[in-house]
Amino acid sequence: MLKALTVAVILLASAANAGAQTGPAASSPGLAVGPQYDTTHVYVAPEDFDRFVTSFVATFGGSLSKQGVFTVTPTPSSTMSQLVFTPVGTVSVFGFKTPVPYPFGGERTGYLVKDLDAAVRAARASGADVIVEPFNDPVGRDAVVQWPGGVNMQLYWHTTAPSYATLQTIPENRVYVSPGRADAFIRGFLLFSGGTVVGDDAKASGVEIGRPTDTYRRVRITSTFGNFAVLVTDGHLPYPYGRELTGYETSDLDATLAKAKLAGVRVLVEPYSTQDRRSTFVQFPGGYIAEIHATVRR
């Protein structure tokens, strides 16, 4: 299983036309802490846990929190947990030793917030459904929300604020939604995050979704939580498009891929170029799929 949650890993480390909007949305200000606390959630089998962690650090550099076994859900469960800190983004890795309680495993990321109750209220007011009501964990509180289009994310807060290094590049949450729900998702997330649409391309190259003869709509959003790419498609996607959760930006794509291959990472989509990027898709040991890209300077 791939997808996961960030509940207690910190234990280890102690509009209908929203796409046209170009300014920040009216929001509940001050909820976000910073993009280094936007952690992609990765589930792997316990036997693949160390291989994944080792390969991820070998590819991007960085460091690890202490590994442990915890209960990180509001109902009984047990999982291996560890944070991986890299210059291009943080991941929370989980290897469940028990069945995973519903709906955990369906959320893609965890966002650290300054006030969980305020964040949950703001999410509801912005059109999100709270699918896991706030609950206590040993270091704070957590909730899971679902945005229009079925996009699940965790909101979390800790009694003692963690302190992570500033990232060299901001990872990109990559969200695939249908045309019928895209504007509702964009409008709601902008309202919640106070984000800004920095690009809305109605005819982005289909090579980005494995369909080089077609075009599709791609919306890019930035906020204090981090970066978002909203990929609006009809769902006719060849593998592995849509299976990735995050895009990681590196300064040298070829050098990063060389490190990845030495670490046992499999290239699923060979590097290709678009107007502003060279990109590839890879699969890490344990099954986690990611997009990796370098910005093309023109």
Question: Where are the language model's segments positioned?
Answer:
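Catalytic cores of nucleotide-enabled group-transfer and carboxylate-activating enzymes in metabolic
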Residues: 91-96, 128-131
